[in-house]
């Protein structure tokens, strides 16, 4: 029996990955992390979608200790999300160590349930400057977890080399375009669906959707080319 653990936030990317995993695996376990993010609605959206999509199990883990260490606009209500980069060249929405912690816990969960695949929606193409969304980081984490648990673990990143328009094409290919567009929460200001239109996350999401809807055949063809190359 093929089992997978999907790191699931209820946003566009992780929901697309979850829908894809449900078509490929016999058992899909979703894991959502409560790290004190600004909007608890994110967790509620993840719970609703996991139930609606019919995952095998959905675990919500309290990792609020991250908020005690990591000062970020995503975890602190008194820090507005900014389009400007900080002195270190990173946006103020970067939560240091977040994906290190998330992938470690997802790997432990996979070990416990006998899964050898962890799926995450990180992407290097439109990664907002986050170093823990890069392929070299994921590869390093994959090696560390596999060695540390003596498990043939594979961290899969289906969106790693897709741009946002191609991610929308993938959702459409999976028959989930409307669900991803109207029921997911990507917005840093906590608005479901098309969002606020002003924060960096909404900017990426909306630009990608417009590009896809304006050039459906072209973008879908580009997606299929990347899928063929990956296999």
Swiss-Prot record:
It comes from the Bacteria. Pathway: Purine metabolism; 7-cyano-7-deazaguanine biosynthesis. It holds the Pfam family QueC. It catalyses: 7-carboxy-7-deazaguanine + NH4(+) + ATP = 7-cyano-7-deazaguanine + ADP + phosphate + H2O + H(+). Its cofactor is Zn(2+). InterPro entries: QueC (IPR018317), Rossmann-like_a/b/a_fold (IPR014729). The keyword tRNA processing does not apply. GO terms for biological process: queuosine biosynthetic process. Binds 1 zinc ion per subunit. GO terms for molecular function: ATP binding; ligase activity, forming carbon-nitrogen bonds; zinc ion binding. SUPFAM superfamilies: Adenine nucleotide alpha hydrolases-like. Belongs to the QueC family. Catalyzes the ATP-dependent conversion of 7-carboxy-7-deazaguanine (CDG) to 7-cyano-7-deazaguanine (preQ(0)). PANTHER family: 7-CYANO-7-DEAZAGUANINE SYNTHASE. This is 7-cyano-7-deazaguanine synthase. It comes from Vibrio cholerae serotype O1 (strain ATCC 39315 / El Tor Inaba N16961). The gene is queC.
């Amino acid at each position: 029996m093929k089992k997978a653990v999907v790191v699931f936030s209820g946003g566009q990317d992780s929901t697309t990955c979850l829908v894809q995993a449900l078509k490929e695996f016999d058992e899909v376990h979703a894991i959502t992390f409560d790290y004190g993010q600004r909007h608890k609605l994110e967790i509620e959206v993840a719970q609703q979608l996991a139930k609606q999509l019919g995952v095998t199990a959905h675990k919500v883990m309290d990792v609020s200790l991250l908020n005690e260490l990591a000062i970020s606009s995503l975890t602190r209500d008194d820090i507005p999300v900014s389009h400007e980069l900080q002195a270190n060249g990173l946006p103020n929405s970067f939560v240091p160590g977040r994906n290190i912690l998330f992938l470690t816990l997802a790997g432990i969960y996979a070990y416990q349930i006998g899964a050898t695949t962890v799926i995450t929606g990180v992407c290097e193409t439109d990664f907002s400057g986050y170093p823990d969304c890069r392929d070299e980081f994921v590869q390093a984490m994959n090696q560390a977890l596999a060695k540390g648990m003596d498990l043939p673990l594979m961290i899969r990143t289906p969106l790693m080399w897709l741009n946002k328009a191609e991610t929308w094409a993938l959702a459409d290919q999976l028959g989930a375009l409307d669900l991803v567009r109207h029921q997911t929460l990507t917005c840093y200001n906590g608005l479901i669906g098309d969002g606020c239109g002003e924060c960096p996350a909404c900017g990426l999401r909306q630009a990608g959707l417009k590009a896809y809807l304006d050039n459906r055949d072209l973008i879908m063809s580009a997606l299929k080319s990347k899928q063929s190359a990956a296999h």
